[in-house]
Structure formats: C-alpha cells, structure tokens
A protein has these predicted regions:
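Non-catalytic, mostly N-terminal accessory regions of nucleic-acid modification and defense proteins
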Residues: 1-3, 8-140, 199-212
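Conserved Class I SAM-dependent methyltransferase catalytic core
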Residues: 1, 132, 184, 249-274
Length: 274
C-alpha cells in the first residue's frame, strides 16, 4: 500500500484520527517490490501482513499470512507483485484515496464471477447497490446496517452517496454481520481500505442464532441476504423476540430475514432489500 494520505509517516495517531490504516515501513510497496523475485518473497509478504495488523488493531487476525507456504509458487507470486508495480505507481504519495478501494472491488467482482452463483453470497453488483442507495438516500450521522453484509458493498456505496451530496463520509455509523469467516475478513479489509469505521462484531457469526447487534435500531437497512436459505435453526429460535409477526417457517429463511430487519429498524427507518 503506497498512499500516505499527506500525513507524516511516523505519526500513527494522525492516521487513526483520519480513519486511515497505517502502513509500517516493512509493509510498504517498495519493500515488497524489491523482494518480488527473491526466494524470500513469501516471507516478506507474511511479515508485511503481520506488521500491518500490529499497527492496526481492527485488522487483527484478518489479513492472510500464508504466502510463505512451500506449496505456493513464488515465481507466480512475484509476477503478481509485478502486475501491481507496473500498473500503479504504488510508491508515490497523494494517490487517489479511492483508487485502492476501486481496485479491491474490481477483484472481488471478478472473483464473484468465477464463483458463479456462489459469488452472490459475498458480492452484490455495484449497480444494484447504487440503485438501493439512491432510493433510500442515507444522510450524515445515520446508522446503516446489513445483516448479511458479504464484502461490505452496501456500506461503500452509502458512504459515497453521502460524500457526493456534500456530506462527511466518515459521519456514518456502520453495522454489519457475516457468517462466513473468509467473507467477514474481506469486509473488514474493504472498510479499512475505504477509510470507513465499521462494527462487524468481534468475529463472524450466524445472524439468526448469534445476533451481534441485539439492541441496534438502524436508520437504514440495506441487504441482499441468501433467500431460500435452509435449514436456519428455526427449532432453536421458536420464542425469539424478533418474530413479531409469527415464527417464520422452517422450510426457508425468507420471512426470518424480513422480520429480523424489521426488528432492527428505527421508528422512521427504511429498508432496501434485494
């Protein structure tokens, strides 16, 4: 990661105040690029991930640290590093702060395409998300919630909408939950890259059996949950307080998702549901 956001390299607190994650010296792109075609590239990348996590507590246990795996082709790894080095000047300061976020989103989208139908579990096309956000029109100091947040695209577009309407993109409270561990990590990284402060809970968890935001009342709920999802542990939740309109059927989670969202909606809140 090369962008220094015009803040002094050594001033970690300044980065934190600006909601920008700090990249220590051993994790900066010049260090990685210099080692691209050495036998130690895997170790260099693992050390970079560890250093970033050490200086950014919100990313603790989130970044991959298996690049030194002997089964991983180090020549291919070096070639991937070269692609970024030759395509983007990762060393200069003042890089468009949205560039890395857009790059990250691009790769998530391509990965979702390769996964086929399974890719919909963690990625909703940005055009769909933008449509939801344009309809709901989130505002500054609002609370936005996604109970099946995937890689966090709903939050990215909400922050962009607020910024585009002369608001402060940091003045948004983001809450999400995700059951898949890898996807939860993707969302955490997405928010860090975008400079969005988010509460996704301390770990991944099933939204129905372990609601990580039990008292939340959100102003906006945007979601593309896995409909027709079953089994969803209905038998363990028969007396749950979220089922204001009756216990949802065990056959699929459609009405469980809808009632969960209604339960977490503020009195004047709005829901955007795919």
């Amino acid at each position: 990661v090369g962008s220094e956001m015009c803040i002094r390299d050594s001033d970690i607190d300044a980065y934190t105040m600006e909601n920008v994650f700090f990249v220590p010296e051993e994790a900066r792109w010049n260090t990685i690029a210099d080692a691209a075609h050495t036998p130690e590239i895997g170790i260099v990348l693992d050390n970079a991930m560890k250093a970033i996590e050490a200086d950014n507590k919100k990313l603790k246990n989130v970044l991959p640290k298996n690049y030194a795996n002997p089964d991983l082709d180090k020549q291919v790894l070096g070639d991937v590093v070269d692609i970024f080095t030759n395509s983007i000047d990762m060393s200069k300061t003042g890089i468009d702060e949205d560039l890395l976020g857009r790059t990250y989103e691009y790769f998530i989208a391509r990965f979702a395409e390769k996964e086929g139908a399974g890719g919909g579990e963690f990625y909703t096309p940005s055009s769909v998300v933008r449509t939801l956000v344009e309809i709901l029109k989130p505002y500054e100091n609002c609370r936005v919630y996604d109970p099946a947040c995937g890689s966090g695209g709903m939050f990215v577009q909400s922050a962009k909408f607020i910024e585009a309407h002369n608001g402060n993109r940091s003045a948004i409270s983001v809450y999400g939950q995700e059951a898949n561990a890898d996807t939860w990590k993707m969302a955490k990284m997405n928010m860090a890259i975008r400079g969005i402060d988010a509460d996704f809970g301390p770990y991944q968890a099933d939204t129905f059996t372990k609601d990580l935001h039990p008292t939340l009342k959100a102003d906006f709920i945007l979601a593309n949950p896995p409909f027709n999802y079953h089994p969803w542990n209905q038998e363990k939740l028969l007396s749950d307080g979220r089922w204001k309109y009756g216990v949802p059927p065990a056959s699929n989670a459609n009405y469980a998702w809808i009632q969960h969202m209604i339960y977490h909606l503020s009195p004047n809140g709005k829901i955007g549901l795919v």
